[in-house]
């Protein structure tokens, strides 16, 4: 990370605030904080932003893309610190200045491909951070697969870390939630890596049914209690039914990730639970697993936060596309779904908006042919990309 001057002033820019856009404005930041901004071309000597957007750095609550860098091919394991650095570079150049790295707390006998190696990757993130190798600000999101026998033990090993900002309650047992249609889940596994045979899938599904019956209820209570003990926000995952909504309310969930039906989304929203949907869902025009489209939820006023999920560049693309799909959403409110609202959801009050005194986590974005290009990225005032 390098900085060539104590103060940076950008002029001739479109400044995206929380409630409006300054169509021709300027912004100054120093000592890692936003100092001033206003209308007009800017003070003499301002760096010309050539009419580009200046936005808060994006805030990502749910991405498992680190796994693609650590295991770039089936059974090929990269150096974990090198994988973190590569992944971090992709995040930064996608405009993401704060990320909750989503680590799967999930160990399963006979299913090496779903072992997220959460502890190993968490330690690699720490090592990269301590060596000043990271451009984005990294926190952890522990994705707890509730039916797994060792999930409570593994979560306890990680939950005391100061960088844990979110825990989610997952249950990928076949025939429910995201994959109510078992056939779609079978197709998903057949398409992964070398694929799985029907016999292998039968064995996998039988084991997961048994795990859910034996462990899910007890593990759910213990994981929820663990999160509340450590004052870590909780997220539900793939809520589908009224029962799922009732459970989320009971467990004092603050964010609902990827509800699969509009009925569930309505119930969650009425309970004051923030709705998080996938940015790829917006960009592609629908869910890859055939569930509710994020744009349909947005039209109903049921979309609060976007997440890049599995492709970092989708976060910015989706935010800029939302106003094209939903008349009630303007650019400022669309940008809130990837900045201020996710920041508030996990208690990061010092960032996520352009306001005096907030962190100078900023991005400069050029848009051509409806494709956004991140020209520059600053984290706490330092140019990192």
Residue spans of the language-model regions?
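N-terminal metal-binding scaffold of metallo-dependent hydrolase/deaminase domains
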Residues: 1-43
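Glycine-centered positions in the ABC transporter ATPase nucleotide-binding domain
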Residues: 13, 32, 51, 95, ...
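Metal-associated gating/positioning segment near the N- to mid-region
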Residues: 49-121
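Hydrophobic faces of well-ordered beta-strands that scaffold small-molecule active sites
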Residues: 59-61, 99-101, 138-142, 165-171, ...
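Active-site glycine- and acidic-residue-rich loops that bind
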Residues: 142-153, 239-243, 247, 255-257, ...
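Glycine-enriched alpha-helix->loop->beta-strand junction motifs that scaffold or abut catalytic
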Residues: 161-165, 248-255, 270-276, 301-304
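His/Asp/Glu-enriched, well-ordered alpha-helical/loop segment
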Residues: 271-281, 285-366
